[in-house]
Amino acid sequence: MPVTKPYFVTVAVLLILVDKTTGGLFGLRSGKRREPWVSCELYQGSCRNACQKYEIQYLTCPKKRKCCLKFPMKITRV
């Protein structure tokens, strides 16, 4: 009988962890809908139809939009 108490505690902890993990049990998707990952956000860009004159296009975003990154400008006086 003393073995059953740690067994039930272990099962309870595992069930709580499975509920709290994002992927669910064995990486299966839960009922929560996640937004698709946009690689443009990794570089702190923004998805637009056209880039501004101070921006450069680096990647492509979903729906055929452009990933616009701010062009690093260093003004030096000569």
Swiss-Prot record:
Position of the signal peptide: 1-23
A GO cellular component entry from the record: extracellular region
Pfam families: Defensin_beta_2
Coiled-coil segments: none
InterPro entries, A to Z: Beta_defensin_dom
Subcellular location: Secreted
Keyword annotations from UniProtKB, A to Z: Antibiotic, Antimicrobial, Defensin, Disulfide bond, Secreted, Signal
Keyword Oxidoreductase: no
Transmembrane regions: none
Major subcellular site: secreted
GO biological process assignments: defense response to bacterium; innate immune response
Top-level taxon: Eukaryota
Residue pairs linked by disulfide bridges in the UniProt entry: C40-C67, C47-C61, C51-C68
Family indicated by similarity: Belongs to the beta-defensin family.
Record function comment: Has antibacterial activity.
The name this protein goes by in its record: Beta-defensin 29
